[in-house]
Curated annotation (Swiss-Prot):
SMART domains: FKS1_dom1. It comes from the Eukaryota. Pfam families: FKS1_dom1, FKS1_dom2, Glucan_synthase. Catalytic subunit of the 1,3-beta-glucan synthase. Synthesizes 1,3-beta-glucan, a major structural component of the fungal cell wall. Involved in cell wall synthesis, maintenance and remodeling. The keyword Cell wall biogenesis/degradation applies. Residues 74-83 have a biased composition (Low complexity). It comes from Aspergillus niger (strain ATCC MYA-4892 / CBS 513.88 / FGSC A1513). The gene is fksA. It is a multi-pass membrane protein. Component of the 1,3-beta-glucan synthase (GS) complex composed of a catalytic subunit fksA and a regulatory subunit. GO terms for cellular component: 1,3-beta-D-glucan synthase complex; mitochondrion; plasma membrane. This is 1,3-beta-glucan synthase component FKS1. Its EC number is 2.4.1.34. It catalyses: [(1->3)-beta-D-glucosyl](n) + UDP-alpha-D-glucose = [(1->3)-beta-D-glucosyl](n+1) + UDP + H(+).
Amino acid sequence: MSGYPAGHYEDGYGHQEHGGDAYYQDEHGQAYYDPNDYGDSYYDRGNYYNAEGGQAYGQEGGYYDAGHQDDYYGDQYYDQGNGAPRGRRRGDSEEDSETFSDFTMRSETARAADMDYYGRGDERYNSYADSQYAGRGYNGYRPPSSQVSYGANRSSGASTPVYGMDYGSALPGGPRSREPYPAWASDGQVPVSKEEIEDIFIDLVNKFGFQRDSMRNMYDHLMTQLDSRASRMTPNQALLSLHADYIGGDNANYRRWYFAAHLDLDDAVGFANMKLGKADRKTRKARKAAKAAAQQNPENVEENLEAMEGDNSLEAAVYRWKSRMNRMSPHDRVRQLALYMLCWGEANQVRYMPECICFIFKCADDYYSSPECQSRVEPVEEFTYLNEIITPLYQFCRDQGYEILDGKYVRRERDHEKIIGYDDMNQLFWYPEGIERISFEDKTRLVDVPPAERWTKLKDVDWKKAFFKTYRETRSWFHMITNFNRIWVIHLGAFWFFTAYNAPTLYTKNYQQQLDNKPAGSKYWSAVGFGGALVGLIQILATLCEWMYVPRRWAGAQHLSKRLMFLIAVFIVNLAPGVVVFGFNNVLSETICLIIGIVHFFIALATFFFFSVMPLGGLFGSYLKKHGRQYVASQTFTASYPRLNGNDMWMSYGLWICVFGAKLVESYFFLTLSLKDPMRILSPMRIHQCAGVTYIPNSLCHAQPQILLGLMMFMDLTLFFLDSYLWYVICNTIFSVARSFYLGVSIWSPWRNIFSRLPKRIYSKVLATTDMEIKYKPKVLISQVWNAIIISMYREHLLAIDHVQKLLYHQVPSEQEGKRTLRAPTFFVSQEDQSFKTEFFPAGSEAERRISFFAQSVATPMPEPLPVDNMPTFTVLIPHYGEKILLSLREIIREDEPYSRVTLLEYLKQLHPHEWDCFVKDTKILADETSQLNGEPEKNEKDAQKSKIDDLPFYCIGFKSAAPEYTLRTRIWSSLRSQTLYRTISGFMNYSRAIKLLYRVENPEVVQMFGGNSEKLERELERMARRKFKICVSMQRYAKFNKEERENTEFLLRAYPDLQIAYLDEEPPANEGEEPRLYSALIDGHCELLDNGMRKPKFRIQLSGNPILGDGKSDNQNHSIIFYRGEYIQVIDANQDNYLEECLKIRSVLAEFEELTTDNVSPYTPGIATEAETPVAILGAREYIFSENVGVLGDVAASKEQTFGTLFARTLAQIGGKLHYGHPDFLNGIFMTTRGGISKAQKGLHLNEDIYAGMTALCRGGRIKHCEYFQCGKGRDLGFGSILNFTTKIGTGMGEQMLSREYYYLGTQLPLDRFLSFYYAHPGFHLNNMFIMLSVQMFMIVLINLGALKHETITCRYNSNLPITDPLRPTYCADLTPIIAWVNRCVVSIFIVFFISFVPLAVQELTERGLWRMATRLAKHFGSFSFMFEVFVCQIYANAVHQNLSFGGARYIGTGRGFATARIPFGVLYSRFAGPSIYAGSRLLLMLLFATSTVWTPALIWFWVSLLALCISPFLFNPHQFAWHDFFIDYRDYIRWLSRGNSRSHASSWIAFCRLSRTRLTGYKRKLLGVPSEKGSGDVPRAKFTNIFFSEIIAPLVQVAVTLVPYLYINSRTGISNDNERASNAVVRIAIVAFGPIGVNAGVSGMFFGMACCMGPIFGMCCKKFGAVLAAIAHAIAVIILLVIFEVMFFLESWSWPRMVLGMISAAAIQRFIYKLIISLALTREFKHDQSNIAWWTGKWYNMGWHSLSQPGREFLCKITELGYFSADFVLGHILLFVMLPALCIPYVDKFHSVILFWLRPSRQIRPPIYSLKQSKLRKRRVVRFAILYFTMLVLFLILLIAPLVARDEGISVNLNIMSLMQPLDTDNNDTISSYTGNGLPVGYSAWTPSAASASA
């Protein structure tokens, strides 16, 4: 009994010898609750309606009162749960363990009624402690378990929160206590009393070795659930339904697993006698041995035979299961629930493996019922379960991803395919073949041990042998072939059918344009019929890919050989007729061929439809078949999709019929028919005359038209894919709008009279009035709710006092003498009338938005609310890592960023002027009251003037006195308008206020009962709110917070004592060399403050190790999920908000789960087939993005979220396609926690953790709904960088999802309409972005090939009225006009595809806010260039997915939540966006430049805009980018950024950027020198060689081919009449231009290396910058060489501009390919430090040890690539800066630019920063210096560009015809014949040049 002073604990509860437990009181023992002090002061009836000064203020909820301590809680319902050190915790001796006394001293006699110290109080309201006890310190302290258990009689000790055991209530004869779980009160009705439940828990702890704290936590968890259910049904029904949900019901995961894994057969006949499927050799041997053993034991055999004689079908097993469940006693049901919860509550990472927990529970349950367990006397040691069962599994998980290096855990360099993740481990338990793999060191199997003995043997299992990969998440594009095979089938099949029919020239022998001869009819049919073979080929590829990803050894893998055989047969059937028609048409008659062709076509059509509709998993004998038990696990866990019924099903069919109907019609007429003429023209076209290129055969030149045609068809195919997404967006939007009218959420349904009927609707829809005992007039009840809403808005400073007066219900004298009546505000009537809009609240204000949405939403259909007493309990769960809790004064009123021009407070005042005004008035009233209280005299007239001046500080910073209570008000005002945790918590605590308000309004008898005692009334309301609503923040870093964070958290806890905080507590290792011990701990505002400023935790549960193994967020949620309470969880991010009027609807929202009413039928009645209703797993809610309207970027981000979270969610939920639980969704607690938790957590793979919860829910049979009448606020990113970080995170996360098994299950098993909904809502969006960017690139490639063709040919005179058989004039011309028309159509298509993203936003605004709001918002968007941002975002998305699928490296990117007002330096922006966008944009712009000079058409203007967007968006959306001074200061920074980092290391430098972009391919060396470098770098594993090969070698090589071919063609000298002309040597020319710089750079590098080695060490002593100077010279030479080579190209092309541009495009592609080749194939891994780079320039290699031998060679190759890249970056950076010059020269451009970015009027603009004199002078000097440099560079660049053009026009040329290097200008080549002679001349071509065009015109 050490540690407990004797005599303190008698008879199981403790006496307070020291006059009470002071921490529940303040020092003076005064009253705990002062109604004027707390935020809910409007519950005080006396002052309720008096809104004139005084009472109504409540100061923002009363938290500003600095003296507001946590002693406010007078009601003692809250148990601390740990008053003294717990039993064995910090190394106490064994004797201290409570288990010793507990187990042996059980005495049933202590249960007599006269000793009911634990207060089974009755349900009346008079059970508060008598006032005689108040203030005396009898504080109802309830000792924690570790103390209670020493009590002599009652030994339980687990009744965790006994909320309120004051002496007055607990002593016999005194008033009864308030129950913690009132609905589970101990009257005769409960099947098991809570004391018995407690005993069950203690018994289980002693038998299995669970932790005490975990037991107390889970006891509270179970009791809260029972209480929650029993409040709306009988206790017996509550227990039964809970048991059915967890263990035995049709929807219980445990029951489904039990039958899926054939454990009914194991229980019946044993594993040895089961017929099992495939297994490896080792397992087969083990099976044989087990069978032999069974045969040796004849008694067992008889039993087995007896059992086998019985019926082992699934039906019989289900019957046996139900009867077993039916016979179970309530006590046994509770025991099973308790055991399951205890297993789950300590399972750490194993909670991600639901079937593994089921297995553990099954073993434990079998063991419990065994004689061995029942006869145990000694309790099992605490922590046994954790250490023996969970920790080995945890360690296996952790070791998959981490290894120990120097005593620290370091991430292994493994990609997902090598990591056995949570899902692989979990899937071992799906099939009996998996379970039988579980064996011990001695190779015996766990399944050969009798079930009852398995638990004790579980600790000896060798898990390493058991687990294996069940799905390979190989990083590859081939996943898409398998997962989305039906998308390829539908699109490629339809495209083939359309195109083949319209391309007869491709299969017409000797086609002649003047004859327009057609192919035979059979060929028409058969050519189209080949589409069936194409579709079959896709399916064959999909099956082969599936073979790669699903290991054959997994029992759930489908048999693919049979399917493959079938598919090959189908392929042959679809191919053979075509081969006959085309190959044997000479042998067979045309009639037979025609019949074969027609049959071929219909076979193809049938194949196409069959493969389009049938899921891949359902082909030819699938495991989707319902009969047979072999694959029941895969059906259960991956294909239990809830069926769509009725309207939903028809809506789903309707949507997709509309989408594809419209798509196919439009694609046929717009895309296919527009390609018909180009195909007819280009396919037979031959180049007539062609001198060709040296070393290259002439056939290339002649085939240019066919190459172009191939590229055009590919381009058409990409547009064909894009069309589908376009129509999906349009149709989805139409369906969504139709549904919004149906629900009444649109403002275009005025017949609903949303305002005039609002009071009636509040009465009928928000209040549960049917069960009210005392009936009041509706107006009395409505007025209380309405006034509460208005006052809450007033408190939040949204409404001024005069607005409030107009909006409140007022008491006025009535006609009857002495009576008073309520007068309703005129608002309800006049608000419908548009002319009165501004009378009640400021136009366009937050208050208007909130009231309008509230009125609108209660007009929609809502479930009827239950009374508060009967509503279910729910928890709000908020994960928090490092987000701002509360803004500090320093952050608000000083400019933090060196580049920012505004303080946060200034900016917020600009954004919310009206709210700031209300706040200031409020503060002044408060200050005046304070000064009057302090006895200051009244002011006279003269003082009034002075006070105006004195009030200035209020308007500037919100306070005049620096007293904390005033500064805190300003901090809170700002925090409530930024994205802070404080805003989130204060918003979601409105649930508590709403519940109290509803309870008070609906139960007037409660108010009457307490008479005038508002303190007791408030206590009763608090009790109810606390019982029904919990809020828990998971602050994993809480224990490591700094002082400021700790203070802010403490402030939160004092403001909201019911706020629970779960955090990770760390203890140093007990022994040297061990790991530190980690605990999940929980505190709240009632917990005792310790001396170190921390609070004493209520629960502290030890973990197996560090739980943060993944990307953080999901692990953070997982460790705190054990502290959720009740039936539902609302998952919230730390940047959200909620409002009182929304919280009032919570009962209707929870009713959407369809669990509030249950039939009184037992789910366990055997023989009766219960109709399994699919449970609702997730309920989505709307989001209002409160960061909209803070400028263009914030608004774009907000509009995206709004349309996705509301507009699309509305239809997707309806048609079963919604997966996301975007936050603020509600989750079904039991459903989700028994199926792997609320998110997944494998590092990298589950980066977008929340969507996996949605996919799991869908696959496992849960429905996902969307609720239209409830919305929370949410913040979004506001700055360019943070929005794109978020975009990158989503994009890379999507790349990871493509690899995931969930996509495989959904893609290969969903029915067609559901599959399409899933595809287009999730992966389709990202693939669409990739197709958009692919189409842009393809279009540019088509344009350069077309440009080359047009440049070298003469275009025919075109007349669209003439028939196509008319001869072309002039003869041998090229008929390119239809091709130019096709180009224009493509531009239109791509343009529409980009702009379709604005349609949902426009429609959303139109339906919900009206035409004017839509017009203004869109006008603002377009006026702010948001379309350029859209193009850029599209590229970032596409790049993120592409990079991730190639290289991986997905990681959580923390996104900024702050306001983006700071200017970011050019160098930083360039390095961040060069790789993803600027490089690609500049390559495409070069191509566009060539196209513009050869095939100009006005439609290309759109491409100039969109491609410029890819390059300049980062700078265009950078605040103050065009401020004159800042621009040149920035230029200075850019020059420094380029040059630094070569003599000493610098993180922000060009060389650091260059090395970082290399490491993707090379990876880092594993040797960690000293401290591992930044987190970002360590997580990047080296990409797989095959991935590097395809994306870094093959892709650039293709780029070389598609740019080199047109370059060689344009230099082929076509149209030469003279046959003796020599071919030009374009190959050597391009080689000189491409390889020249590389050679020079290599020479320079080698030479400088020698210089550095010889001179570096000597010069380094005196000249510190020797290395930097050497590097600068080398880099300068590289730049000069690049500029020289540009001129050389110009010169060698005889000053021809188009040829030079195309030559540079081609040379750049070749150089890029060479550099990628060097980096991919020749470079070894990179060091994390950059010593070798510095050594190269300084010659100091001796620091590098042995590496100084290997590194110089590697560094030489690096330098070759670096110099090449540097020269490109230097030139490109300057060009970008020059492009900004025109904008820079516009007067007042900075003001205009800021208007665009921040949407602030020029009058409210942000002032320029103020500098000291010294700073100003320095800045001016720098500006002058660097402006001179900038303009010098500009002039130099212009000279280099213009000089050659002048030389050409002047006719200056040098005939330098060595090796025919010079390209003749060939301006006069023309071999067309103007006069037409003869007929049937072959169509030929000749070269055309600008001058030739004029000649031939």
